[in-house]
Design a protein with these regions (language model features):
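Acidic, low-complexity Ser/Thr/Gly/Pro-rich repeat segments typical of extracellular/periplasmic
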Residues: 3-4, 19-206, 218-224, 231, ...
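Short, composition-biased linear "edge" segments at structural boundaries
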Residues: 225-233, 505-513
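Alpha-helical transmembrane segments and their immediate juxtamembrane flanks
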Residues: 235-258, 438, 515-531
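Calcium-regulated, polybasic anionic-phospholipid
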Residues: 446-452
């Protein structure tokens, strides 16, 4: 019995000692030190490197966290290296190289912040293992940053690429080959290349859908530095590389019946002056309407139902022409739905709209009525804003309650279906319930400027200016706004993206340095320098 007790005590002691070696004693000081690399085989910055396996030893147990996103190998390898262990703690990291290495090349295995100690997760920041297959280690550096071209969205894990400008370079290389050097912003917007070779380079940034370091214009965002990078002259890029999505070349996709009397035509890219014309013979009573769907590459085509089993259309734009057939099947007509864009409060400067899902062919103003809280009739007009949108126009009085009613058959759509009785109630607020933002815009560019007021990234109001002037955004609901200025270099009143092959940078967008936290009955004045 005593022998058994002695064995248990010894085993318990061994377990306690073992645990003590991996963790800190209860009540001891917290370990705040990052792991330290003790040795590497082959050694760090080895030249004439010709091995397939690398073993790195640390002063404590480490784990690898987020390695798939943190690890950047430059130049990139065709076959990713096998790095172990992952998921368990160890004092060693093993790297197995599966690819054939280039001659006379400096390689960098940048682990980012993936190497952390096992107990307190202290990060060994920007840990690298470097070697060269040639006679020396390249040592030049390049730093910079990236930014979105149009929005203020936060960027991270942006791939930054360097292509050597030699006799083999063509612009098409970015669509086919991996770069000569690779970096990443990881969790920030900054990047740094190290161990670069002297020479001239193209500098690119990619926000990729897949991490293959090859540009896919359909899925990826791209940014490029407008000038040639020359090393060792260039070490710091002062202005951020701006990322944008290219507009795709026009490509018609297909036409499909989605409900009875409605076809959707899908396309890709910039539609230009795309025309869709019916070429089938149809009855004299046939009517059709078409409209592009907002923020989608879709044209909706509504028509009075016919007994035919298909319709033929001619599709054309500047560089494309074709004829297609759309099969018609036994589908149901979309019932008429009518919505008011005003919930309960109608802003004093806004218009009351009624929107429908189907095109409106007839509206009868005599079936509309607008009254105030005392049922006093309010003079108004009804105008067709778009094929499926009516504007109710009237002079709004502050702090007033209104009722809008539409009797049956007040609105009739393309399928000759009409509304039931509709009733809407809403009110206006006092002028004091709103605020104003007044900007003294000092324009230091020769181009016109599009001034936009934004609420959570959505455009609330727009002003187009050609010279320095006072821009007033008034009668605004109390909330937080941002303001941006778009330098409209081609004077088409919209923001234009860039294109790599034509070396066109996106139009410059400048956000005012701070948000406007507007309160009721406030007037906020600022100076905005646009250059």
């Amino acid at each position: 019995m005593k022998n058994k007790l002695l064995i248990l005590v010894v085993l318990a002691s061994v377990i306690i000692v073992s645990c003590a070696r991996k963790g800190r004693p209860e009540g001891g000081s917290k370990d705040e030190d990052a792991p330290i690399m003790m040795t590497a085989k082959p050694p760090y910055k080895t030249i004439h490197f010709d091995k397939k396996n690398i073993k790195i030893e640390f002063d404590e147990y480490v784990v690898l966290k987020g390695l798939s996103k943190q690890l950047v190998v430059s130049p990139p390898l065709k076959y990713p290296p096998i790095i172990t262990p992952q998921g368990t703690a160890s004092k060693y990291i093993n790297i197995e190289i599966l690819d054939t290495l280039k001659t006379n090349t400096t390689y960098t295995f940048n682990f980012g912040n993936a190497v952390q100690d096992n107990n307190e997760n202290n990060k060994l920041e920007s840990f690298k293992y470097v070697f060269s297959t040639g006679n020396y280690i390249d040592s030049l550096k390049l730093k910079g940053s990236v930014a979105p071209a149009f929005t203020q969205k936060k960027l991270k894990n942006i791939s930054v690429l360097l292509y050597r400008l030699d006799s083999t370079y063509t612009d098409s290389i970015i669509y086919k080959q991996k770069p000569n050097y690779l970096s990443s912003t990881l969790d920030s917007t900054n990047f740094e290349f190290t161990n670069l070779r002297k020479g001239k380079y193209l500098l690119l940034a990619l926000k990729e859908a897949s991490s293959d370091y090859i540009f896919n214009s359909k899925t990826d965002e791209i940014g490029f530095y407008k000038d040639t990078i020359s090393l060792p002259r260039d070490t710091l890029i002062l202005n951020p590389i701006t990322l944008f999505k290219e507009v795709q070349p026009y490509r018609f996709k297909r036409g499909k019946e989605v409900s009875k009397g409605k076809i959707q035509f899908g396309y890709e890219g910039k539609r230009g002056n795309m025309k869709i014309e019916l070429v089938s013979k149809v009855p004299a009573s046939f009517k059709s309407f078409s409209a592009y769907e907002k923020d989608k590459d879709t044209l909706n085509y509504w028509f009075t139902p016919v007994k035919q089993d298909s319709l033929n259309f001619s599709i054309s734009n500047k560089n494309f022409s074709d004829t297609i057939t759309v099969r018609l099947r036994k589908k149901q007509i979309d019932s008429l739905a009518i919505l008011s864009e005003v919930k309960s409060v109608l802003p004093l400067k806004d218009t009351l709209f009624l929107s429908t899902n189907n095109p409106i062919t007839i509206f009868d103003k005599s079936k509309f009525s607008l009254v105030d809280k005392d049922t006093v009739a309010i003079p108004f007009q009804v105008k067709k804003q778009r094929i499926n949108k009516l504007a109710i126009l009237f002079e709004k009085t502050p702090s007033t309650f209104y009722k809008l009613a539409v009797l049956p058959k007040g609105i009739i759509d393309v399928y000759e279906t009409s509304n039931d009785t509709l009733k809407y109630q809403f009110k206006t607020l006092t002028v004091e319930d709103y605020g104003s933002i007044i900007l003294e815009v000092k324009k230091q560019t020769k181009h016109p400027v599009i001034m936009q007021l934004l609420d959570k990234g959505e455009v609330v109001k727009t002003k187009y200016i050609s010279s320095s002037e006072k821009v007033i955004f008034d009668l605004l609901a109390p909330k937080e706004y941002t303001v941006r200025a778009i330098i409209d270099t081609n004077k088409n009143t919209i923001w234009d993206t860039g294109n790599f092959l034509s070396k066109q940078q996106p139009e410059k967008v400048i956000y005012f340095e701070k948000a406007f936290k507007l309160r009721a009955n406030w007037e906020m004045n600022e100076v905005f320098i646009v250059e």
